[in-house]
Design a protein with these regions (language model features):
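Active-site lining segments of carbohydrate-active enzymes
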Residues: 1-28, 32-35
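Extended polysaccharide-engagement surfaces of secreted carbohydrate-active enzymes
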Residues: 12, 26-183
C-alpha cells in the first residue's frame, strides 16, 4: 500500500497507511517480535511475524525517512530472524529447534523473498531512533477498534484482548478479556 501511495502520489492514502503503520508499531515487542496474540488469525502467526506474508520491512523502509524508528524495528526483527534460523532454515519460534519441532520450508522461502526485495532498496542516510513504543514504560494503552489493551509495567509487557470478532474457523484466538501475551 505504501509503494502504491508513493508511486500514485495519493496523499490521502499515504496519510491513512502512515497512521496504520504507526499503530502497528505499538505491537512490536522490545526484542523485535510482533504481538498478534489478539488477532483473529493469530493461529497463523509466529513469534517473528506472519508465517507466509512478505512482512513489514519494505513498507516501513519506504517511510523511514519520516519515521527513523522504523529502521530500528527492521533491525530488531532481522536480529530475531537470525536467532530463529538454524542450518539455513527459519523456525516458527524461539524454542522450536531445541524442542524438536521441525522448521517449515515455506517460512524460509517466503521471508527470503521479502528480505531480498528489502535488500535491493537504496540505502538511506538516516540514523535509527533506537527506541520503539514498547520500550517505554507507559502503563496502559487501549486500542478501541480491536478492544485490546497493551500493558507496559517495569520490564513486563502484556496484551489483554476483548476482541470478539470471529474468523471463519471458530475458537482460533483469545476472546472476552483474555491475557493473550505476556513478555
Amino acid at each position: 500500500m505504501v509503494y502504491y501511495a508513493l508511486m500514485a502520489k495519493d496523499t490521502d492514502l499515504l496519510t491513512l497507511v502512515d497512521r496504520s503503520m504507526a499503530t502497528h508499531l505499538e505491537f512490536m515487542l522490545p526484542d523485535g517480535a510482533w504481538d498478534n496474540s489478539w488477532g483473529t488469525r493469530s493461529f497463523k502467526w509466529t513469534y517473528w511475524g506472519g508465517r507466509t506474508s512478505d512482512g513489514f520491512m519494505g513498507g516501513y523502509y519506504a517511510m523511514a525517512a519520516q519515521h527513523p524508528e522504523y529502521l530500528e524495528a527492521i533491525h530488531r526483527n532481522i536480529q530475531l530472524l537470525k536467532k530463529t534460523t538454524s542450518e539455513g532454515l527459519l523456525y516458527g519460534g524461539m524454542h522450536y529447534r531445541v524442542s524438536g519441532i521441525a522448521p517449515c520450508i515455506h517460512h524460509t522461502f517466503g521471508h527470503a523473498k521479502a528480505i531480498t526485495s528489502f535488500l535491493e532498496l537504496p540505502p538511506l542516510n538516516i540514523t535509527s531512533s533506537q527506541e520503539l513504543p514498547r520500550d517505554k514504560t507507559y502503563g496502559l494503552k487501549y486500542f478501541k477498534d480491536i478492544h485490546t489493551w497493551l500493558i507496559s509495567q517495569g520490564p513486563w509487557r502484556a496484551t489483554f484482548t476483548g476482541y470478539d470478532a470471529e474468523y471463519k474457523i471458530k475458537g482460533t484466538h483469545p476472546m472476552g478479556g483474555a491475557l493473550s501475551m505476556l513478555w
